[in-house]
């Protein structure tokens, strides 16, 4: 018998990852409570999500850059209807896009879930900060909450 999820907490099964060589450093950093992004060594464009080539110049080499873990709400949606029964306890919740501080270019935004907030009070341009939710020994998920 499985324990039902708590309100606002997504079931662990939704966090299974199958990281490849391009994204593994992101997950390794998250386990340490750090937000990182790949950056093109040729033109400086950020690659989030990490990809095998640069979105701007198609260069292949990257460097991993630690980001401050802050940003602003660029866009969001409030999910009010569970798409699966296991999600019923967590609705409503907010998902959206954060424009990350310390980045520029095509990969400067990240799709996220917002936590520790009333979704109805979330606003475009709100300042937010990363929080790291340890799901298990292998997976730590990056979420965002309103800045304090």
Where are these regions (language model features)?
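A broadly conserved sequence feature marking short terminus-proximal activation segments
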Residues: 1-35, 147
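Residues immediately within or flanking Cys/His clusters that coordinate Zn2+
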Residues: 34-37, 51
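Short, cysteine/histidine-rich loop/knuckle motifs that typically chelate Zn2+
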Residues: 39-42, 53-59
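Short functional micro-motifs and their immediate structural scaffolds
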Residues: 48, 62-63
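Short coil-to-beta-strand transition motifs
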Residues: 63-72, 124-126
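Glycine-rich active-site loops that engage anionic ligands at enzyme catalytic sites
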Residues: 74-116
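Well-ordered alpha/beta subsegment
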Residues: 103, 109-148
């Amino acid at each position: 018998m499985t324990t039902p999820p708590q309100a606002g907490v997504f079931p662990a099964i939704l966090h299974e990852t199958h990281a490849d060589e391009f994204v593994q450093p992101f997950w390794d950093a998250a386990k340490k409570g750090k937000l990182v992004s790949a950056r093109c060594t040729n033109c400086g464009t950020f690659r989030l999500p990490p990809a095998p080539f640069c979105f701007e110049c198609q260069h292949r080499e990257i460097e991993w850059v630690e980001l401050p873990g802050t940003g602003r709400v660029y866009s969001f949606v409030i999910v009010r209807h569970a798409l699966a029964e296991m999600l019923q306890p967590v609705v409503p919740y907010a998902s959206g896009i954060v424009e990350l501080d310390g980045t520029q270019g095509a990969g400067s935004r990240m799709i996220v879930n917002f936590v520790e907030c009333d979704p109805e009070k979330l606003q475009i341009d709100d300042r937010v900060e990363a929080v790291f939710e340890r799901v298990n020994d292998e997976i730590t998920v990056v979420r965002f909450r309103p800045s304090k």
